[in-house]
Amino acid sequence: HLLQFNKMIKFETRKNAIPFYAFYGCYCGWGGRGRPKDATDRCCFVHDCCYGKLAKCNTKWDIYPYSLKSGYITCGKGTWCEEQICECDRVAAECLRRSLSTYKYGYMFYPDSRCRGPSETC
């Protein structure tokens, strides 16, 4: 669920998804094309790929069980879709934390028109 993903991002990075990640680069936020601009954008690209493997699941709105404790995100037991969506979100939030040192404010509201060329394959 998007609100749960936002909480994971905030837990890992101490930044709100909006405005820091919702429109970042070519892949953070809705859709994406071209090459990821940097490590942060690549986290979003990989997250999009992860969701892409879950076509039968309601990735944006399915609510899943998880906890934020002792510095870790733990996905709980749920339906197959819930568990997979949670793992996609957990891995992406941790990736965004690892990419904080190279976060570029210039990519924060990056125009889609500048995302050109073929998309990478997942």
UniProtKB/Swiss-Prot annotation:
Keyword Kinase on entry: no
Gene Ontology MF: a single term: calcium ion binding
pH dependence per the UniProt record: Optimum pH is 8.0.
Family matches, as Pfam families: Phospholip_A2_1
Reaction catalysed by this enzyme: a 1,2-diacyl-sn-glycero-3-phosphocholine + H2O = a 1-acyl-sn-glycero-3-phosphocholine + a fatty acid + H(+)
GO cellular component, one term: extracellular region
Stored InterPro entries: PLipase_A2 (IPR001211), PLipase_A2_Asp_AS (IPR033112), PLipase_A2_dom (IPR016090), PLipase_A2_dom_sf (IPR036444), PLipase_A2_His_AS (IPR033113)
Cystine pairings recorded for this chain: C26-C115, C28-C44, C43-C95, C49-C122, C50-C88, C57-C81, C75-C86
Binding sites annotated in the UniProt record for Ca(2+): Y27, G29, G31, D48
Keywords: Antibiotic, Antimicrobial, Calcium, Disulfide bond, Hydrolase, Lipid degradation, Lipid metabolism, Metal-binding, Neurotoxin, Presynaptic neurotoxin, Secreted, Toxin
Cofactor: Ca(2+)
EC number, as in UniProt: 3.1.1.4
SUPFAM superfamilies per the UniProt record, alphabetical: Phospholipase A2, PLA2
Localization (cell): Secreted
Major localization listed first in the record, in broad terms: secreted
Record field: temperature dependence: Optimum temperature is 40 degrees Celsius.
GO BP: any one term: negative regulation of T cell proliferation
Cofactor: binding comment: Binds 1 Ca(2+) ion.
Tissue expr: Expressed by the venom gland.
Protein family (similarity comment): Belongs to the phospholipase A2 family. Group II subfamily. D49 sub-subfamily.
Oligomeric form and interacting partners: This toxin consists of 2 subunits: acidic and basic. The acidic subunit is non-toxic, without enzymatic activity and comprises 3 peptides that are cross-linked by 7 disulfide bridges. The basic subunit is toxic, has phospholipase A2 activity and is composed of a single chain.
Alphabetized PANTHER family for the sequence: PHOSPHOLIPASE A2 FAMILY MEMBER, PHOSPHOLIPASE A2, MEMBRANE ASSOCIATED
Known function: Snake venom phospholipase A that has strong antimicrobial activity against the Gram-negative bacterium X.axonopodis. Antimicrobial activity is not abolished by EDTA or p-BPB and is therefore not strongly dependent on the enzymatic activity. PLA2 catalyzes the calcium-dependent hydrolysis of the 2-acyl groups in 3-sn-phosphoglycerides.
UniProt-recorded name of the protein: Basic phospholipase A2 A
Organism: Crotalus durissus ruruima
